[in-house]
Structures are given as structure tokens and as C-alpha cells.
Amino acid sequence: MDNKKLLTTKEVALTLDVSQSTVRRWADSGYLPCYRVGESKYRKFDIDDIEKVKLKIYSKDSSANKEYINKKRVVIKKDIPPLPHPAHYLMHRYWGRKAHNVVSEYIKNFTSEGDIVLDPFMGSGVTNIESSKLNRRSVGIDLNPMSVFIVKSTISNVDIDTFNKYFNSIFNELYDKFHNLYDTKCPECGNTCETEIYVWEEDFIKKVRGKCKEHGLFIKDVDDFDLSRIVQYKELFNELKMTGVLEYPTDPIMQYVKRSGRERIDELFTERALIMLSSLRKQILNIEDENIRNLLFLCFTSMLPNVSRMIPGDVEKCTYKSGWVISKFWTPTVHTERNIFTCFKLRFKTILKGKLELASIDSSLANIYNMDSSNLFNIESNSIDYIFTDPPYGESIAYFALSHFWNCWLDFNVDYSSEMIIDSYRRKDYVDYAFRIKQAFKEMYRVLKPNHYMSFTFHNRDLNIWKAILEGCLDAGFELMGIVLQSQAVSSGTQGINKKNTLTGDFVYNFKKVENNIDKTTYEYMKNAEEFIVNTIKEFLIKKDGATSSELYEYIIPIVAKNHAYCNDDGKVINIESLIKKNFDYIEVIKFDDKGIGEDYKWVVK
């Protein structure tokens, strides 16, 4: 026996991530072959034998798997301070992106290297990307083709020099052809120079911001030259449209996300922007290298909101404000039109920075699929080590309707009928949502290994949605192990519009797949639930001397969930917002702190 290949009990324990007592017990039972070496007769283990056992431990049928996976798998019970998103998560906008370091900590806590992590509602792919960074394999599922496109493009292996070469070629060709569409005149010297920003009021340009090579940045009222340029590009637009050269989507905007009178996707852009975008799209389509083509399309689609009419403007300063801050297609009365050349170059630089950050990532570790999470037919039963996901919140975010803004430019086919959402315009009601989410949790239960964990984040205060989600988990056979209120890295668009009434964090629910529990899960709705909720809130408000909406909901919702206090005595789901308004007062208060006087709102006992 070669002593160089022999490991001590401690070394084996570290290799297999189990205790030394477990190693000794497995050796005594014959599960781990061992050798008595030297006068001391200490146990020694052959490294080849240990590698074979390690493979067994990772396999779904291993008798050791249960004890192995429970080793150090302690449910997280504290808030993890979120960190800002690194560059590779800023490559493309997507809703509900979770703090990468929080997701990473959960993956590290519940898995080991080589394990398989599943996210059946993948979104922007944080779970899959963080899994790859940690040398875990992963499966990402999303019915939205835009989600799949973003994640695959983010993790794809591309030659950076080739990417840079194609970008410059396309950019220069487009610039030579259309740069004059952004021509304006410097108010100081009268020289022709390039416009950076136009500020519109309704359908009329009010201000122009440009840059002169001699006099630098300037702001001016629109003049006759600028008006002549509008006539020029509108004539060009009509000419190209008549000859069939222009190709852009004219799809109707879905009713759920429609706002401010725009009926079609193309109405969210100026004619000048449509000329540029149509030409740019055609150039990208001609690229043969699929990964390069997709990455340039990622630059293209990530730019679309920034060059649309949805960016609020400031007439006096001739600048733009943060755009698309609400989950609707809204064109403000005063809006901006930005220079597409500038925006395309900025998006290229952002995406290049993100790709450089992920240069060492092994893209083969992540398997990404465009499919329905309620039918995971391509995943074997009991094969997944851990699930971390962020399920759709009923009607909170219309992912598919909003992604239509991008999907239609890329000609993606979308299965709207299978979307998990509440949308009365599409006859997608609560019953449909609850049924689909329940089927998804059944599939998650099926593919997860016994005694392994599922974590999901949730951010909603409608008890109907909580009831559908949590009962879907329990009916599938999962056992609730704990709830954590997790701070968010950044506020959502909804929070930005309505800060005083929204939750500031996400709940992270941790469930365990208990073997043979699928037919044993029982629960009863609490009787006198409304009285229970009111009394619980009253005690909380008295103790805290009032609470904000966020503090109140973040306190009461987990209590309601744990006690199944969803329904009133008539069996109807409680409208918790109405119940709170009926029994408590919402008052404006003045706060004094080191920054001076500030206003706040809080709930108090009547």
C-alpha cells in the first residue's frame, strides 16, 4: 500500500464534509474501506476508495446522502446585508433581481461543490450565475424567452477582441449613414455639431443639448435648423417605410401595461429612433457567430428603454431623469430623446465590463431552458440538491407583457397562456394562478432530493397570493423550516413611486422536502382569524408606539402564514389592507434627526 495515497480520519472527514465520528462509524460498518497501519494501528484510508464513496454521496440513491446533506445545513435565520450589483448584473434591465451576495450565501449554506442547484423561475439568472461562481452545477428554467436570452448571453464564452471588432464595424457603418440625423448648430459659432439630448413636450421639441468641438456643451431652444432636421428624418422615414426597408415591431401594447395613450410598441419611439434601430437590428442579424450576434443584441435590447419616449425630461436643464421607473409603458408629457450612437456605445462599454468580470466563469456548469416550470419533464426525480427561486407574485409584475418590449424586436415566440399571473384582461384569474403555482411546487418537490432544501423570496402583501404560494408548498409535501426578512439591495420601481406604502424587504421562506410527506401534510384555517390579526397588530403597535406600513406588514404576514389565518369566518380570504384601515389610524408624523425635519407616516392604535 502506497502511504502517499493514504488519508487520515480527519482528512477524510474534510474531503467528504462529514464529522470524524461519522467517518469512523462508516469504517466500522464497512461502508468506508480502511486499513490499520503501523504499530499504532490507526485507521488509514485509500484516496481512490474515498473518491468512489464521494461519488456515491453525490448520487441521488446514496444511503449516506441523507446524513451528508444534513451536515451543516442549518437554516439561515438572519438578514444578510445586501451588496450593490456588480457590472455583470447591470448588463441588462430585469425586474426583481436579488442581491447576488445574498443568493450566494444561501447556495453556499445549503450545497457543496458539484451539487446541482435549480431555479425554476430564473429571471435574470442570479441563482445560476452565482452557482457557477461557486463551482456548482445549475439548472435555470423560465417560460419567458427574454429571460433565457439574457442569461445565456451573460454567461456565454466570447472572444472579447472579436466582440469589440464587430461592435466597431457596425457602429461606424451606422454612424456614416445616419449621423446627420442628429445634426444641430452651435449657438455661439454656428458650426454644425452633434445633438446629445432633445427634450419634447407632447409631440413638439422644446430644447436641444449639443456639444460643439470649439465651445463645448450647450443648451438652446429649438431653432429653424432643428425643425428642418425633423422634416428631413420624417421624410426619410416615410420613404424607407414605403420601400419596405424599415423593419420594426408594430405589435399592440398589452392592456395590462398600457398607459398614456400609446397603442403600439413602435409608438414608444420617434421616427428618427425607428430608422436607426431598424438599420442596427439588420446589421446585427447578419453576423454569423451566434454568441457575438446575441451579445450585440443584448447591447441593442438593453439600450431600447434609454432611446424610447419613456424617459422623463427636464425642459429647463435639458436633461433626462431615470426612465421606466414604473412597470407600465408610460410616455411622460415632457420626455427626452437621446442620441442612439451615444447610448449604444454606453451599453457596449457596460456589457464589455460585465463580460470581463465573468471571463473565468465556466458556462457549461449552467443548463438554461425556455420551458414551463409546472412541467419539469427534463429533470429526473430526486436529482436536485437545492432550489433557490423567486416565484411570480400574482399581479405584482407583468413580466411577459413588459418583456414584450424586447421580445418583439427579437421575434421571440412567447407562451402567454401558460404565464403564472393574475391579469383580468387575459382571463388570467386567481384560480388559474393558484393552480399553476401549485403544479410548479409539485414539480419542485418531485425533482428535489429527500431531506434537501428549497428557499424562495417573496414580496407581496395580498393574502390571496400568500395563501396560493404557501399552500402550494405544503400541499406538495414541503415542510416550512423558517422565515427571514431580507433587506433589498435596491428599491423596486413600485417602491420608487409609492415609498410610504410598500414593503422594503423580501421574505425568504426555507422549506425542506420531507420524505413520503406528500400525503401527510394537513392544516386547518384558524378560527376567528380577523380578531387574531387585529389583536396581534394592536399589541405590536402599542409596543412600538406605531409602525410604518413596511414594518407592520413585515411583522404580521409571517404570523398570518404560520397560523393559517388567511380566511374570515365566512371562508373568504381576508383583505388585510381593509382590515388594517378599519381598525387602525394612519397618521403623518414629523421626525427630527441630524438631517433636520422630515415627514413620515405610521399606523397607530385608534
Identify the function of each model-found stretch.
Residues 1-25:
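Polyanion-binding surface elements
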